[in-house]
Each structure stands twice: as structure tokens, then as C-alpha cells.
Amino acid sequence: MKLTIIGGGPGGYTAAFAAAKAGVEVTLVERAHLGGTCLHTGCIPTKTLRSSADVLEMSGRLAEFGITGECALKADMPAIVNRKRKVTATLQTGLEKTCAQLKVRVVYGKAELVSAKLVRVTTAEGTEEVESDNVIIATGSSPLELPSLPVDHARVLSSDDALELQAVPSSLIIVGGGVIGCELAFIYRAFGSKVTVVE
């Protein structure tokens, strides 16, 4: 049996690993990097930034724990972002190794579903057609842009942009009080921004 999976995020690679362990011949098609939104612009990067924010926030409460002295700690954004990149790179390498161990064939490119059993993949080298008995579509998500507030990646940022800032903004307005918005609000407030959340 052959299976093609479109999307190498948590849904896609989990399905690929389970199918491969069951003896299925798996082709996993990924447009960019294994790990998807969760690994590259979601759960893992935000938790990594948040751990830095937690440490910085805790440092302001040292006296509560009987630790005194003078210290002026601040967020070093290039170092924080570099740490985040190392964490995601390490986890991505782990996924690549697991694919190799389980003999999951990974094809990097843009997938097009031609029929229920045929996927056309446009890669840097050209076009490849992958035929299989079944296809799983696990294509993930991307940040929503509001027509009234276009992202310019300078003053108006996407949540992805907020994970790569090289300096702490003096103030920040976050549109959206969901999980991502509130998490970014906590992170940047801990780093020293004056944060307003609009919901």
C-alpha cells in the first residue's frame, strides 16, 4: 500500500510515522520545512520566547526569594531569537532523522491534487507525479491578514514577524486576544514593551 501526505506539520508527520510503522510506503510532500506552523511559527517558537520572558520576569522577583543585590537585566532580542532558531532547527533535524529511519520519502515542493490517487509536486528541479492508494491533506495554517490593517512587516506585523523582532518595541498593540495574541502580549510585556491588546 502507498500513501501520499501533503503537509509536513504535526498532522502530516504524525500520520506519516504511524503509516510507515504499519508497513505503508509513505511519501510526505512539504512546501517549506518539516514541522509546519507548530515548529516554525507557532507552539515551539512562542514557548521558547516565553521561557526567556519567564526567566526575565522571575528575575524581578528575586527579593521575594531572599536574593538581593544590584543587577540590571534586560532582554537581548538577537540572543533570544537566535536561541529560538536553534531550538526549532534541532527539532526539525530530529523530524528529518525520524523520516529517514522510518523510510518516509520526503519531497520538498508545492503539491497539487490531480485526482484521488495522484499528486503533482512542483519542486526546484521540476515536476514529479506521485501515485498512491490514498492521499492525506494536512496543509496547516497561516496568519490571517485583515483587509483594513495590511501587514507591511515594519510597523504592522504578523504573528510570524513578532517571533523574529531584533529589538524590543517601546509599545505594542496586539489585535486579537486569543491564545497567540495573549501569549505575545505576555512575552513582550515581560521584555519591557507597553502592550495593549485589542479584542
State each model region's role.
Residues Q166-E199:
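Rossmann-like NAD(P)H-binding beta-loop-alpha module
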Residues G9, K110-E112, G178:
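Conserved acidic residues
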